[in-house]
C-alpha cells in the first residue's frame, strides 16, 4: 500500500488557537483512496522546520500533502521553504501569476509584491487553480513521488483537493476500496476487550480494529470499536470487515454475558 505524509503548517495550530481539521479531513480522504497515512506533522511558520518536514516526508512517503502558508502575509512561506527543501531557486510561475492576477483584478485590487509571492514555486511545478480563494495550490512530482501544497483555509484546501488532487491520486494509486463498521459495547472495560481485539486481528490480518473509550473505564465502561479494511474490491473489503465484526461480537458475548452490544 502506498504511503502518505500530511504536513500542516501554522503557529495557530501549535498554540491551540485553531483545531487541525485539515489533517483529519485529508487523512480520511487518503485512507479511502487506498493510501496508508504514516505521519501527520504540525510545524510552525518557521522556514527550517518546514524544510525539515518536507525533506523527511519526501524521503519516506510516496505522497506528501501540506496545508497552510501559501498566502501573501510575511509568515506565509511554505512555497519558498519547499523550494529550499528541494535545493531549487523559487521562480514566478506564469500560469500561477495569471491565476492570482485575475482573482485580484476581479475584485479591483492591483498586483503587489506580496501577491506575486503567491505564484512562486519550484521550476517544473504545476499550479492548481483555487476556485474559492486566491492562492493556487502546487503540484510537484519527482522520483515517482507526488507532493502537493494546499492553502490552509479549509474550504479552499478541500476544493482544490477534490477538484484536482483526488482524481490524480485515484489514477495513480492502487485499486483500493475501504470498508468500516462501528460497534458500541457497554458494560465491559477497555482493558478486558483488548485481548479480544488482539485475537480478532490475529485471525483477520487484513483488518484493523481500534477501541475508543466513551465512558468511565471502571464505573461506567462504554466503548466504540471501529473495524476497517482496504482491499482491491468492495466485496473483499466488506467481507473482511464483516468476518472480523462477527468474530468480535462472538468473543465478547462468550466472555461477558452482561455486555450490551449495538
Swiss-Prot record:
Family note: Belongs to the CinA family.
Cysteine disulfide partners in this protein: none
Coiled-coil positions: none
Organism expressing this protein natively: Pyrobaculum calidifontis (strain DSM 21063 / JCM 11548 / VA1)
Cross-referenced CDD domains: cinA
PANTHER family the record matches: NICOTINAMIDE-NUCLEOTIDE AMIDOHYDROLASE PNCC, NMN AMIDOHYDROLASE-LIKE PROTEIN YFAY
Name the UniProt record assigns to this protein: Protein Pcal_0062
InterPro entries found in the cross-reference section: CinA, CinA_Arc, MoaB/Mog-like_dom_sf, MoaB/Mog_dom
